[in-house]
């Protein structure tokens, strides 16, 4: 048996008045997901335990069949693993975003979704001036980077606010707080004049693109402890395709292969067809392949209802049919689900359970008429903890 997992990041949400009380997932045209739901098992999965931040790291850890509590790794450390950074015992890795503040307000947590080329140039400029025995800055993809701090374990307990949680709000009240926070705030302040004279920003000003006015640190993580590799835990080989460092970092930590597919990105510019075709090709020498698509989450953070619907529809139109065609051989099971909701009204993650569907040989339908939060709730099936979805897929 072969297995395909499709993660529609942040695709779940809340009912919207503009959509007649329907969610973006309900309103999206998803005939292929709906067809799988009618023939498969549909329910809700509790991917984020009570009391835990509804992060993609926790939720995706659950989907992969691990416990986000017992197998917890801080987000910064996960993304550091994706970049090939080996953390020492006295090092803390943090996500560092390039952002845009306008009159002190978080106008873009992603500096207008700056290109990787431009962002890396800016990060190189900052690193050249600020890297020392305490700080090391590593470029990532687009606006997402990693800052490694040596000798300050207290940073693990600082209070942080992700910048995407405060879009359109004054940033100053949400700066890091607690013991050690002043170290990070000082770093962020020292980066500002470097950004003001950046050659990249001069070019962006001419083109009318949002300037990178600041950097913002959050999501700390220390070196991961002993994690059981996926192959040892499940007895099968696996691979991951994703346009973001989070999933690629989880792949590294859990011993999964990473698929390098040209055109796969973490935004609406993702080449869905290339991602689907590359993942399906990987089934020839892997038992399980995970297709992670970030675009619905990005549009949820932007509060763009139409764009989020379009992203969900693109997955259904360009990825799911190709998976179904491969499944016609009769030896493929499919799991499709969001990791968490990213409601348009909230513009950040929520902690509610998310819909899932499992379809394929040996799976008997349980009465769902389509794939949505409402249909999943109507079946009465709830998997808590959410890691049980992997058990259901592989049983």
Predicted feature residues:
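Feature captures the catalytic ectodomains and active-site-proximal regions of enzymes
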Residues: 1-395
